[in-house]
Amino acid sequence: MRLLDTATPSVSSIPIAPHATQPTETAMTITAQEALTRCIEHREIFHDEMLHLMRQIMQAQISPVMAAAILTGLRVKKETIGEISAAAQVMREFANKVEVTDRENFVDIVGTGGDGSHTFNISTASMFVAAAAGAKIAKHGNRGVSSKSGSADVLEALGVNIMLTPEQVGQCIAQTGIGFMFAPTHHPAMKNVAPIRKEMGVRTIFNILGPLTNPADAPNILMGVFHPDLVGIQVRVMQRLGAKHALVVYGKDGMDEVSLGAATLVGELKDGEVREYEIHPEDFGLSMISNRGLKVADAVESKAMLLEALGNVPGTPREIVSLNAGTALYAANVADSIEDGIRRAREAIASGAAREKLDHFVRATQQFK
């Protein structure tokens, strides 16, 4: 593990500003026109103003033309950590919540997507392994947009009923240690934004809000991101949102996972402090292996590769799932370190417990049909 020097920001093309300017005074409200002007002038929209603005956008109180202009303006001027935090707070307000009483070792495993790697659903496979090893998982996901197979697609292929109410998701977590929250069901207000995003056809702030807005409010998270600059940004957003233990990762081969094919950048929030470092497969006794063999064409192929990994079939799928599930176990505070987590993940796979966890979860979701 190599600690990174984060004092000097790197120059990047990603449309996000890493540091927010703190206001001396903030207005409670801001008009759409004022917000757009602020973006054009490359000035920050402060926290309370962003709360007001996002509530208007989510409730369709701003015209589609103006909403699109503001979303574009935010991207061009570069969104700040404060703006992202406020926007995520509003999305959480509008979400259909999942109540979970036992929150010990409770974690979300999620990625932003958009990395263009077209690999099988590594984080989805990892959640079964992590749950079998003692974590409780609240996974928040959707159908594939940039990927060949989103988490919802592969879960359906595996026989999971993804159309559960928040109450039913909570019951699944209590019964199996796993809950899957299908984004359209839990974020109904997004229907007002979806047509705007579709017509725009470019990345906006909403592309990075999904992983920040878990309806079960999991206090711990393993989050993969599509760009290296997002590592430091998202972990600091999680800090503002009150996360307990967060690991934000970016594989330097472009994966929004902990990678076997390259070093992985990590931003970790623990005990209220953030640190950034780099890890390598060799740190954990793993060989560096190209991720090319992990690519799939659709959910059917992703399902097959996921079952290989859970079935303890030797190969790259099993290795990368062990690596990511182990990291999730560390994020969930089940394991004392990533290395300890990998050991626990391997045991869960080799014993058959991970595959049994998948079968149990499928049965639990089917009871609600």
Swiss-Prot record:
Entry binding sites for Mg(2+) 2: 256-257
Keywords from the named record: Amino-acid biosynthesis, Aromatic amino acid biosynthesis, Glycosyltransferase, Magnesium, Metal-binding, Transferase, Tryptophan biosynthesis
InterPro entries in alphabetical order: Anthranilate_Pribosyl_Tfrase, Glycosyl_Trfase_fam3, Glycosyl_Trfase_fam3_N_dom, Glycosyl_Trfase_fam3_N_dom_sf, Nuc_phospho_transferase
Binding residue positions for anthranilate 1: 111, 142
Domain of life: Bacteria
Recorded GO MF terms: anthranilate phosphoribosyltransferase activity; magnesium ion binding
Catalytic activity: N-(5-phospho-beta-D-ribosyl)anthranilate + diphosphate = 5-phospho-alpha-D-ribose 1-diphosphate + anthranilate
UniProt EC number: 2.4.2.18
Pathway, per record: Amino-acid biosynthesis; L-tryptophan biosynthesis; L-tryptophan from chorismate: step 2/5
Binding positions for anthranilate 2 per the UniProt entry: 197
Cofactor note: Binds 2 magnesium ions per monomer.
GO cellular component: cytosol
Record: residues binding 5-phospho-alpha-D-ribose 1-diphosphate: 111, 114-115, 119, 121-124, 139-147, 151
Family indicated by similarity: Belongs to the anthranilate phosphoribosyltransferase family.
Assembly: Homodimer.
Purpose: Catalyzes the transfer of the phosphoribosyl group of 5-phosphorylribose-1-pyrophosphate (PRPP) to anthranilate to yield N-(5'-phosphoribosyl)-anthranilate (PRA).
Protein's name according to its UniProt entry: Anthranilate phosphoribosyltransferase
Gene for this chain: trpD
